[in-house]
Amino acid sequence: MVDTTKQPNTLLAGVIKKAGATNKGLARRVRLLSESDGGEPVRCDHVSVKRWLDGTTPQSRTCQLIARVLTELLGEHVSLEEIGYTELQNPDTGLEYPEEIAQSVMALGAITDRELRMPNRAEPLTVVPEAWSGLVVRWLTDSDHDRSNPPAEPHPITVVDVEAIREATAMFSSFDYKYGGGRPKTLVAAFLDQEVLPNIPHVSPQHPVGREYFREVAALTRLAGWTAYDTGAHGLAQRYLTQAFRLAKAAGDKALCGRILANMSHQANFLGHYQRAIDLARAAYKGANGHATPTTMALFYAMEARALASLRKEGDVTAALLTAERWLSQGSRENDPEWIHYFDLAELYAEFAHCYRDLGNAELANHYAAESIRESESTYVRSLSFCRTVLATAHLQAGDLDAALHVAKSVAETAMSLKSFRVISYLDDFRDRLSAHSEEPLVREFLDFARGVLPSEDSPVSRRLVVA
């Protein structure tokens, strides 16, 4: 904690009293919220609260959590200013939906600046689940007409500029698939910072080439969010994806808007916000229907199925998976945008496997995981690692311990060279599931091996902390 004042915080004391909270009760609620919102867990107790009341200002994240807890207790919004923390910067930069493109560019600049120039000095950004809900409402109710003003000093943009961004996105995506998001993450941010942000304020999406430029910038920004998500920088990812959505909307690309909402659904589900994940996936296919290709629609329904499986809604899961399968089987893929080319039968089978694992159906999880692996291209190393871990879990659910450990060990060997927080988290989940077999010699051998090659349980990656 940083002691910024010795004056008692009477504003905080007044709001705590109004909320009827005790020091112990407030500390407990702050701890619980910090462990469930996708950010770094905060350790505090009644002594910590006493220090806050005496005038010690905690870290920015803790101040935000205090305000959110008091908001919940009172049933009305409590700002940082109302509890005596007026000096803190707004951590929600990048989460607000900008009316003007210039505002989005400023937000994107702040995000890339944070990532590139102060990665170790800045406190981790937190995930704000309410921001997803606000975006869903905006997407489903907003006018199709973009209200952005034309640039004050327009610069000519050529097809070459558009192709340069498209090719950069393809290259960084290849790195992401093969080596994990940690490899291209800062490269994507640097490209945005150096090649895109200086130009985009002078480009109008009202012109055909300008619209294409915005579409490609949105796709690149989406990738920045996806690589951040894969490395566990959840707050950073949420902000990149929000701005990617705004840029895609400026380009008038409803299919890409849906794709970004589907990515948000994926992240929300990963962080345990299952209903919000369902809402995001449904918003994707409702808003993009008639504008997205069948392959893209299949992805949206697959994301809905995955979130429904987390809530154990078996009937709804089956319906969503069958709908995804029907969409994928419709017509050719010639009209698919480049960013959906990866989503093939192997990817859909992987989604089936994930869902059946979460529903506890070991037989079907095993079947679809094996089919996905058979159909997969070897270039998608990370996707294969996910699916093989699901297969290992399915073997474990079926009681085949030897097969489960054999597959999991091969994934752990691959994970050593992958810079992917999510792959590590899959293996952590598998290790947790082994607790019932902890006395088995083969299990002890595997756990010893895993400890030697994977991040320790105290590492930021293993504990699902935000590293932004």
Kindly give the residue locations of the regions a language model identified.
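Short, flexible, glycine-rich and Lys/Arg-enriched loop motifs at helix boundaries
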Residues: 33-42, 332-340
